[in-house]
Design a protein with these regions (language model features):
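Cell-envelope and extracellular/periplasmic
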Residues: 1-424
């Protein structure tokens, strides 16, 4: 990642004498680059070699030869090699993100690849990544595929994406066996897949979408499980730069507000974590928990591409990339009937789908009724029917399905939050 170069390693031995050189050839449509080394001493000769592959949207053919005079004998050949970055997706069914309504196949590319799938973690053969059918080799999910395609097209970097998700599982299911990290469980299967491919040092980011199955537990269970995972990920993937947490959506898990609040606050506790909202994805299927591709997984993938583009590839830090997130809340008139939510992204233009969105807010500690909502740059204002200054906090639960809500100029929904204190 620092040099924009990758490496393809060849290992082998040559038992026969009489050969003068080992030649490594890297070929593209633009030309051939060769390196030669003499074979000195007596056999067996080590044929270990490293081919340097630039990070670009170009497929390379790498061949190894031994020479006898002017005659070459090919001893190894690999086609369609690329060098790029490694991303991991993990969590439950919305991390798996298989097809529920509408195909993502138009986003497939020879420069997005994977090995195995969530249903075939033992696979070790490279394949073009796909997003629709979870049993297909190379399956990475619909929103990860859309995210990857946007990143590839925008930043011209090939990507290897690995999905280790499993539907319907609580956070305990995803934990590492600390005595045997590569045990035959979910964590160990993903780690083994990456370790066998020599990629554990190459993982740049992990994208986590899980929590629906923890809704019946105390949020502390979810938090403790996530903190343990974060520590283990940094141990097993030592060059990990970012962890992206998707805040779960109410619907199949009712509100799960305490878990959603904990997820909102993870970036406040750990500088390597970013959080993404799901509150303004109209493709949400409500009580069914999942998303159509259009206005659902497709949109989530595009939003993540913008976030990773900024964090990993130097794209501009636009104010609309992060989901709106309250920095402070205060009463802003003398009668206690106007409450203003100031956003952390002060430059983002806020939007509201309709006045119906006011019902997604609730005051804590006051019987005042929210009668109106308006928006501005970096702010949302709520109008109350009476003096609400006895309120101590404000909750935003959003809603499931295609219900109008609060979002920024690019449609990124405001994060759900619970009992955020009101400044007096």
């Amino acid at each position: 990642r620092e040099t924009n170069l990758g490496s393809a390693r060849f290992e082998g031995t040559l038992a026969s004498a009489g050969y003068g050189h080992r030649v490594l050839s890297v070929e593209t449509d633009a030309g051939i680059t060769e390196t030669a080394e003499p074979l000195c001493g007596e056999p067996p000769f080590a044929l270990d070699a490293v081919a340097t592959i630039p990070v670009e949207l170009v497929e390379h053919r790498v061949r190894a030869f031994v020479e006898v005079g002017s005659t070459r004998v090919q001893v190894a050949s690999v086609e369609d090699l690329v060098a790029g970055d490694v991303l991991v997706v993990q969590g439950q069914s919305n991390a798996v993100a298989q097809m529920y309504d509408g195909s993502a196949s138009a986003n497939e590319s020879e420069f997005i690849r994977s090995v195995g799938s969530p249903e075939n973690p033992g696979g070790r053969t490279w394949a073009k990544a796909v997003g629709d059918t979870v049993t297909d080799d190379g399956f990475i999910g619909q929103w990860p595929l859309r995210m990857a395609r946007t990143l590839v097209d925008t930043h011209r970097v090939p990507l290897a994406v690995f999905n280790g998700g499993k539907s319907g599982q609580p956070i305990a299911y995803f934990q590492r066996d600390d005595t045997t990290p590569t045990a035959n469980n979910n964590y160990g299967q993903l780690l083994s897949r990456l370790r066998d491919l020599g990629l554990t040092d190459s993982v740049r980011a992990i994208l986590w979408y899980q929590g629906e199955s923890d809704a019946s537990d105390n949020a502390l269970v979810h938090v403790a499980g996530f903190v343990a995972l974060r520590d283990d990920w940094h141990s097993d993937y030592p060059n990990l730069e970012r962890i992206y947490v998707t805040q779960i959506r109410n619907g199949c898990v009712l509100f799960a507000l305490e878990i959603r609040e904990a997820q909102r606050r993870f970036p406040d506790l750990y500088e390597d974590i970013r959080v993404m909202s799901t509150t303004n994805l109209p493709g949400h299927q409500g009580a069914f928990c999942h998303y159509a591709f259009k206005n659902g997984y497709e949109t989530l993938g595009q939003r993540y591409a913008a976030m990773l583009g900024r964090d990993l590839y130097g794209a501009p830090a636009e104010p609309w990339i992060d989901p709106p997130n309250p920095a402070s809340i205060e009463f802003t008139n003398g009668t206690g009937t106007e409450l203003t939510i100031h956003m952390r992204s002060t430059g983002a233009e806020m939007r509201v789908g309709s006045q119906e969105a006011k019902s997604q807010f609730a005051l804590v500690g006051s019987a005042a009724v929210i009668t109106g909502i308006s928006v501005g740059k970096g702010a949302v204002r709520l109008t109350l029917d009476r003096d609400g200054r006895s309120a101590t906090g404000l909750t935003f639960a959003s809603a499931d399905g295609a219900v109008p809500t609060v979002y920024n100029e690019r449609g990124v929904g405001m994060l759900a939050f619970v009992d955020v204190p009101i400044t007096k």
